[in-house]
Amino acid sequence: MIKAVVFDVDDTLYDQKAPFVAALAPIVQLPSSFDLTPTFQAYRRQSAQAYARVTSGSWSTTEMAVRRLNAALHAQDLPPVTPEAALAFQEAYVRELQHIKLFPGLAAALDRLKERYQLGIITNGHTDHQLAKVMRLKMHQWIDRDAILTSEEAGLAKPDPQIFTTMNRRLNLRASESVYVGDCYSMDVKAAKQAGWQAFWFNHRNLEIPDGDWIPDQTVENPAELQDLLLALTTLTKASF
């Protein structure tokens, strides 16, 4: 039986692409109609590796900002930017993140979920940075601070399944009693399944599963479907997912 519903943050609770594009478009000086989706997806794919290199000391935060952005631009055959431009993007991106909002329907679903389940968050990134997003999204209405686990706190980062085990100990629950909701197949779905959790894939970017080793327990493709899935959990007398 499911007793806890735990969420990823970036591009799961809110649309991460919108602030990314708003910050990057003026830097690369492309028409507003230009689709930067491949650059955004490449930027996200590098998140775990970039974070690991900073925490290990092999990259400075400045070096990460430059290398990560230029690698993402290269993935879309766009020219690299100068270090100054990369840092300007990073500053603009942080400003844009101050305006993030929950995906439509999530607040109503969280209201209902809180009545029946423990709620939590597992997120990669520096604790202060991720908690700032959580506060802007007003997630403290539904989730206690001790049920929010960052990779910096855990000393582990997704896709390491051990971060999910750490959360189980924090919530005093078994893996089989936990479900994780996330947008990234490798970081969220595969990692959660490897830890023995159920996994709900919020595949609103319409991505393909890169391998067939781990199948999500449920897949939804837009915020309305995610709301319906979460509300369905609140109507069950015994979890059947």
Language-model features: locations:
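Asp-based, Mg2+/Mn2+-dependent phosphohydrolase catalytic module
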Residues: 1-5, 111, 126-241
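Secondary-structure boundary/capping positions in well-ordered alpha/beta enzyme cores
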Residues: 34, 116-117, 174
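Generic recognition of short, well-ordered alpha-helical segments
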Residues: 18-22, 104-108, 132, 161-162
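Residue-level marker of alpha-helix boundaries and capping positions
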Residues: 60, 100, 121, 179-180
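N-terminal helical cap/lid subdomain that shapes the substrate entry/recognition surface
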Residues: 2-9, 13-104
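Substrate-recognition element of Asp-dependent hydrolases with the DxDx(T/V) motif
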Residues: 86-99, 106-137, 148-151
